[in-house]
Amino acid sequence: MFLAVWILYATDRLLDGVGGTAEDMEARHRFHRRHRRGFEIALTSASLALIPLVLAMPATSLRLYIGLAVLLAGWFLVVHRLTRNWRLKLPKELMPGLFCAAAAFIPVWANRGFDHLELACAAIAFGVLIIFNCLCIYAWEHQQMADAHWTTRLGVRYLTQLGVATVLLSLLAIALAGEQMAPIFIATALAATLLLALNQIRGALEPTDLRAASDLVLLTPLLVAPFLR
């Protein structure tokens, strides 16, 4: 999962740097463009390392991942090709939450099915957390919202409320979940709380530092990993 997510992230950053000027790019895009050759070598190596892991997957999980990969490839095509030609506005801050939640929970869905309330709550809470993370980053890096999709503008306008809703959803899930699932929701609630705190002090930090911190808080599952069974 780590390799696949990194491959998608790095590929997305490299595609963002195609055809643009350095002045129009964020710092992370300039970094990936400057070191493009190194990233291409690393991406090739990571892809080769991923092949045996993919082939070892259970057939049910593999079929679901193939379907998700097709949808994701279509999304990349729309974002990096059609939007530039047709000047489309897309809900870029919403889609990572949908794709990440689906990718993270496919193995469990494949083994347990889709009719588990606890699993649905976990997937929704995780997806909303990723969306909240993306909206925070967008709000921190952009002063103007005119070019954003209406869903992004709406999310940024109610950013604090979305963060509070994520925390409350996670707390409700903790109350409903059994002992086995509770640590997952605790990690989600903690990450959302930390993102809310970062948003409150955003004026004291540089955008690059804020982005790094926003990614760091998503590592909260490491804190509860010893309690997962």
Ranges and model annotations:
Residues 3-18, 70-82, 125-142, 192-202:
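Transmembrane alpha-helical segments that form the membrane-embedded catalytic/substrate-channel core
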Residues 93-136, 142:
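Functional transmembrane core segments of multi-pass inner-membrane proteins
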Residues 148-198:
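Glycine/small-residue-rich hydrophobic helix-like segments
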Residues 29-37, 93-109, 154-166, 212-227:
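Small-residue-rich segments of transmembrane alpha-helices in multi-pass membrane proteins
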Residues 1, 50-64, 104-124, 172-183, ...:
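Helix-coil boundary and interhelical linker segments in multi-pass alpha-helical membrane proteins
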Residues 186-229:
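Extended hydrophobic alpha-helices typical of membrane-associated regions
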Residues 9-41, 129-167:
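Solvent-exposed interhelical
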Residues 35-111:
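Intramembrane alpha-helical segments
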